[in-house]
Curated annotation (Swiss-Prot):
Originating species: Nitrosomonas europaea (strain ATCC 19718 / CIP 103999 / KCTC 2705 / NBRC 14298)
Keywords tagged on the record: Iron
Superkingdom as given in the UniProt entry: Bacteria
Name this protein carries in UniProt: Probable Fe(2+)-trafficking protein
UniProt-listed Pfam families: Iron_traffic
Role according to the record: Could be a mediator in iron transactions between iron acquisition and iron-requiring processes, such as synthesis and/or repair of Fe-S clusters in biosynthetic enzymes.
GO CC aspect terms: cytosol
Gene3D superfamilies hit by this protein: Fe(II) trafficking protein YggX
Record-level Gene Ontology MF annotations: iron ion binding
Cross-referenced InterPro entries: Fe_traffick_prot_YggX, Fe_traffick_prot_YggX_sf
GO terms, biological process: cellular response to oxidative stress
Family to which this protein belongs: Belongs to the Fe(2+)-trafficking protein family.
Keyword Cell membrane: no
PANTHER family: FE(2+)-TRAFFICKING PROTEIN-RELATED
C-alpha cells in the first residue's frame, strides 16, 4: 500500500517516502511532510549546489551547509541558488 502525505513543498496529497531520508529529527520531519516528488526535486537542487559551489562532501562544513539548505528548502524561505543561476523556461 502506498503511503500518502500532505506535501509541504507541493501543497497537495502525494506519495510519501518509503523511509526517512536523513537521520534525526530533520529526517523524521521530511518523512512526515515531504513527498517522493518533492524529495526528487531537492536531490536535483542539492546536486546543483554541490556542483556549482564546488562543495567537498568530505568536509563537515559542506555537509552542515547542505543540511541547513535542505531544511530551508522544505521548511523555510527556500534554499540558496548558485550565483548567476537562471531557471530554465518551462
Amino acid at each position: 500500500m502506498v503511503r500518502s502525505v500532505k506535501c509541504i513543498r507541493l501543497g497537495c496529497e502525494a506519495e510519501g517516502l518509503d523511509f526517512p531520508p536523513y537521520p534525526g529529527e530533520l529526517g523524521k520531519r521530511i518523512f512526515d511532510n515531504v513527498s517522493k516528488e518533492a524529495w526528487s526535486q531537492w536531490i536535483k537542487h542539492q546536486t546543483m549546489l554541490v556542483n556549482e559551489m564546488r562543495l567537498n562532501l568530505a568536509d563537515i562544513k559542506a555537509r552542515k551547509y547542505l543540511a541547513s539548505q535542505m531544511e530551508a528548502y522544505f521548511f523555510g524561505e527556500g534554499a540558496d541558488q548558485p550565483a548567476g543561476y537562471i531557471p530554465p523556461d518551462k
